[in-house]
Amino acid sequence: MSPKTLYDKIWDAHVAHEADDGTTLLYIDRHLVHEVTSPQAFEGLRMTGRTVRAPDKTIAVPDHNVPTTLGREKADNMTEDSRIQVAALDTNAKEFGIHYYPVSDIRQGIVHIVGPEQGWTLPGMTVVCGDSHTATHGAFGALAHGIGTSEVEHVLATQTLIQKKSKNMKVEITGKLRPGVTAKDITLSVIGHTGTAGGTGYVIEYCGEAIRDLSMEGRMTVCNMAIEGGARAGLIAPDEKTFEYCMGRPHAPKGAQWEAAMSWWKTLYSDDDAHWDKVITIKGDDIAPVVTWGTSPEDVLPITASVPKPEDFTGGKVGAVQRSLEYMGLTSGTPLSEVEIDTVFIGSCTNGRIEDLRAAAEILKGKKKKDGLRAMVVPGSGLVRAQAEEEGLADIFKEAGFEWRLAGCSMCLAMNPDQLQPGERCAATSNRNFEGRQGRGGRTHLMSPAMAAAAAITGRLTDVRDLM
């Protein structure tokens, strides 16, 4: 048998049918659903008289549109479109008998945090969702990626998906990370190295000592942004950390089923002589705390750098940089550490887990945010929120002057009440800094939770190492 990558192994195990041209019908183990990309899909089932093929493998959570303030069940601070979408998900989940975590359930949260938290995400699975950041689940050694609404309907009806196989790409982060450098700095640095199109046509496997050293939550952060690097999905081979995380979760296998699953999970790694179509190697100690400066995730630099000049670039990038600087209101040559901010957002499916909140609280403990600055922490799930309150993290945030919110996607995207106003500048732990992503005219700088906390204290982009 020829050597295989982790991606090869998972793919081959899920092929239901393959045509001569490589078009493949792939079996799907888990289908995650939220309120924005699912209403038309469920309506399509009704129109054709179909049911959900595997309701026991379909999990629904409202997250994109839901407000994160107390009293949100009343829905009086949602737009009409948002109310309709959340109500539709509630109706569809009940009618079609799928697993559902409504807003009133403490287990509700961002779908990519709820899935792993509840044990729905397991090694070797195929996982899809009508959301681009489904790649998050690749941290478990699961083949996970986003799909469109028509594909959502197809998976609901058949539990399969028509696909063509991607190429294999290895991203190796060698050695150890330096103090103050986090999983978010890794994933942003990789995108800065490859560009947002560097992974197009590939599934990325992240490996190396620095990746192995990460916790499961850190690995989820890395895989979450594989899509920003252009990749179809991101993967990390499962190991003892993975198995320990999964054990005992509500929907993880138990007893003999656990042992049987483990016997397969332990084979989920890339063989030594497996073929890679592309390999990128980055030294862990070359990675510094980073921030984005422009309107693409590839516009990333160490916090110690300065705003770049358009003439430092070539080709079409020159004009793109000029437009980015104009939109962001930045002047070339300005040290990034002198860029003042108006807002801090800590949360999202990239950095809304308990370890992210711990990292931010560690920087904020005993300190206050800068006067006049708006700052909020939005836990990724109700369970994360409860744990943070139990650990005293919520008190640290509130004493520092932060708003302590309920779970949801929040200010990651302008689809709910948490938005930037035109011209406002935000230090954000989310995953996209596109024009208008956080609100029309809003300016977004991506960074780690610790870096965002540091920025809240000083009121400007700040090297967290100066506060450690």
UniProtKB/Swiss-Prot annotation:
Keywords: 4Fe-4S, Amino-acid biosynthesis, Branched-chain amino acid biosynthesis, Iron, Iron-sulfur, Leucine biosynthesis, Lyase, Metal-binding. [4Fe-4S] cluster binds at residues 349, 409, 412. The keyword Transmembrane helix does not apply. Its EC number is 4.2.1.33. CDD domains: IPMI. It catalyses: (2R,3S)-3-isopropylmalate = (2S)-2-isopropylmalate. Pathway: Amino-acid biosynthesis; L-leucine biosynthesis; L-leucine from 3-methyl-2-oxobutanoate: step 2/4. One of its GO terms (biological process) is L-leucine biosynthetic process. It is an enzyme of class 4 (lyase). It holds the Pfam family Aconitase. Its cofactor is [4Fe-4S] cluster. Binds 1 [4Fe-4S] cluster per subunit. It comes from the Bacteria. InterPro entries: 3-IsopropMal_deHydase_lsu, Acnase/IPM_dHydase_lsu_aba_1/3, Acoase/IPM_deHydtase_lsu_aba, Aconitase_4Fe-4S_BS, Aconitase_4Fe-4S_dom, IPM_dehydratase_rel_enz, IPMI_cat. One of its GO terms (molecular function) is 4 iron, 4 sulfur cluster binding. Disulfide bonds: none annotated. The keyword Iron-sulfur applies. HAMAP family: LeuC_type1. Catalyzes the isomerization between 2-isopropylmalate and 3-isopropylmalate, via the formation of 2-isopropylmaleate. Heterodimer of LeuC and LeuD. NCBIfam families: leuC, PRK05478.1, PRK12466.1. Belongs to the aconitase/IPM isomerase family. LeuC type 1 subfamily. This is 3-isopropylmalate dehydratase large subunit. It comes from Roseobacter denitrificans (strain ATCC 33942 / OCh 114) (Erythrobacter sp. (strain OCh 114)). The lineage of its organism: Bacteria, Pseudomonadati, Pseudomonadota, Alphaproteobacteria, Rhodobacterales. The gene is leuC.
